Structure formats: C-alpha cells, structure tokens
C-alpha cells in the first residue's frame, strides 16, 4: 500500500463529537474532510463556529443526555470513525462537588455514552474510536481537579475498550494534547507570565495549534496505525518529558 493510500479516507464516514468551536474538534473535522471523508460534527452550541457553517452537517448535542446520544446513533446509518472531543472545565470551581460532577459527566461519562451508542456502527464497519484525553491526565492541577481526573479516566477507558472491542475489529486509541491555542485556553493565555513559563518548559518553545492535534488523530485512524490499539499519544511539544 502506498503512503498516499494509507491516509486516504475517501468514502469513510466520520463523526466528531465536540466541534462547535474553532478548536481541536473543528481542526480534526477539517483534516478528515480534506482527506476525503464525509464528516458530521456536533457541539453543545446551537450552531458551529462561523467558519464551519455550511461546511459540515451539524447536530447540537448534549453528551450528558443519554436519550439524545442514542437518538443520534439511531439516525446515523453508518459510521467508520468516531472522535470523542467534547469536554469542559470549570476553572476555579471544580472543588465544589456539583461542578466536579458536571465536568466528569461531560468529559468521562459523555465519552463513554457516545462510544457505547455507536459501538454497533463501529463493529459493523470494523472502525476506529479516537478519544481526546489531555496532558492533565498525567499532571496534577490545583484549579482543575475534575478535568484532570476525567481525562485520566478517559485514558483508562481507552485501554479498557481497546481490549473489550479488539475481537470486533475496532481499534481504540487516544491523544493527550498539551497547551493548545483554543478558546478554552484563552483565559490562561491572557497571563503573559504563564505563556512565557509554558514556552520556557516546552522543548519546542511554543504553544500548540489545533492543527497540531489533527495530524496524529488522522494517523491513529489510518491504515498506517493498523497494529495500534489502546495507546495514547502525547502531543505537547515535549512538555511532559521536560
């Protein structure tokens, strides 16, 4: 198989859950579309980011609503690749139990709900599931304990589903982004000292862009990664090894 064929997604049907903002999910969706796939995106917002309106079919979806998730699965005739990207933080409030539970419900339970709902589709297509974890699965965070705990659990869920579903021909992998320039990180990036500290520790000397995550996700979903399952790729410019 040629290198070009390894990354040709022509005819593949992709669902990116959590792509209503111009961030990681949207970048992943655009990359799959550019590689020939048919792509549907979801998000909590009524509409996608302005630059994506009209580019993708869009479904407003609350991943904490099991009936809504199952309903979307029932309306989806075929799926080859599912990307779970929906996530939130409650910065500075996650020590409050209600906020903690809500973050975990979206980030962890939402990932699990969506994976289970689309399991029959992925089994039928011998497809791929890609979960978006985080560097905070490894590092503690005094302000975001729920986010870190939920993303660590997403990594473990990825390993468990990889084992459980391998016999069905489904590969399950994850990526763990580092500091990325998105709307979600805007508050952190408003502090010049914090930006400088991240750049100083990161061997590659910069924050990542959403497109930096899209390429590795396409790799994991491609035939080039056909013997990989249960893995989580750190995409953080070397931050986690510095």
At which residue positions do the language-model features occur?
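Residue(s) in the substrate-gating loop at a strand-loop-helix junction
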Residues: 134
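Short, small/polar-rich loop/turn modules that mediate ligand/substrate recognition or access, typified
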Residues: 166, 171, 228-230
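Canonical Rossmann dinucleotide-binding motif of NAD(H)/NADP(H)-dependent dehydrogenases/reductases
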Residues: 6-39
